[in-house]
Amino acid sequence: MSSATSDRMTRQELRAGLSLASIFALRMLGLFLILPVFAVAAGKLPGGDNLTLVGIALGIYGLTQAALQLPFGMASDRYGRKRVIVIGLLIFAAGSFIAAAAPDIYWTIFGRALQGAGAISAAVTALAADLTREQHRTKVMALIGSSIGLMFALSLVAAPALNAVIGLSGIFILTGLLALVYFGSIVVLQQ
């Protein structure tokens, strides 16, 4: 292989990097999209006037995600990266749909906990490492990492507009549907 050829990412590496960055971005979108609107929108839910419960609903996502990163990472080593990512996306989607249909703040907390329980970050980055050559791994990891900042900025702008059009339940439904779309993209990646 010539030096010029090895200096460039292959089509498969680029596709894997973009797909995995998109999946990671979805997770960040699920976390960030409700932040600008949740405290106000939650006030319409029974129990949503309790600021402690609103804070728990916001924070439980990150708590369950952090608690389950290591177990999901170990499961991806044992059962395969794609399988764990698919399961995580399905758990995330289920949590999104439960939060969308939540009749009160307690069900919202449960839905958000499930969203966070689909802890796929470790499996996504491990799969990125598996699918790229060493000299291109940093580029793919940077692409995945940049999705965090991009989703945060996008969420701050899009969330109020989305909330005005589809409401908080619609935002949860949207993130659940996106998880199902990305479920398809992970299936087509090489392993």
Regions flagged by a language model, labelled:
Residues G111-I148:
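Cytoplasmic helix-loop-helix junction between adjacent transmembrane helices
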Residues A39, M151-N163:
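Small-residue (Gly/Pro/Ala) motifs that create kinks and tight helix-helix packing interfaces
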Residues G62-L70, F152-A153:
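Residue-level signature of mid-helix packing/kink "hotspots" within the transmembrane helices
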Residues E13-V40:
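Pair of pore-lining "gating" transmembrane helices in MFS-fold secondary transporters
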Residues L177-Q191:
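C-terminal membrane-cytosol helix-exit motif in multi-pass small-molecule transporters
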Residues P36-L51:
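Short amphipathic helix-loop junctions that connect adjacent transmembrane helices
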